[in-house]
């Protein structure tokens, strides 16, 4: 390495010695700036600490709210489970009741259908019996009417025969009475004449 030049080195020292006040001013400025930076950093750190505390408080509050919500959700799930169980129980009970009622109704329907079939059979039998009875009654009435007509004709014949016989008997009796009356009348006239009485003057 080439030897250092003293002249140059001496001049630098002189320059350094001469620039010491300026260097002090620079250090003062740097110190002032450093103090300012430290103050700003402290304020920034204080602000960050405040924000961190607020964030922590918010986080704790949120955690508390989350715990409350989880408890509420757990309670609601428990309530929902109880409600679901109760609804299932009610549904099964209603289903059992409805099935029982349906079975009873089905049994009632079967019984009513059986009774209806029996009633229809009885009704058919009663209708046939009534029709047969009416037919027999009509036949009896027709037979009685026929007999009555025959008896009426016979009675008319007998009546006419009796009337004819009576009229004939009356005619014969009348003739006999007239003959007897004529004889009696003549006898009376003869008796009157015997007594001298003229029958024409009476």
From Swiss-Prot:
One of its GO terms (cellular component) is cytoskeleton. Its main location: cytoplasm. The keyword Coiled coil applies. Keywords: Cell projection, Cilium, Coiled coil, Cytoplasm, Cytoskeleton, Flagellum. Residues 1-29 are annotated as: Disordered. Residues 50-161 form a coiled coil. Component of the nexin-dynein regulatory complex (N-DRC), a key regulator of ciliary/flagellar motility which maintains the alignment and integrity of the distal axoneme and regulates microtubule sliding in motile axonemes. Belongs to the DRC12 family. This is Dynein regulatory complex protein 12. It comes from Danio rerio. The lineage of its organism: Eukaryota, Metazoa, Chordata, Craniata, Vertebrata. The gene is drc12.
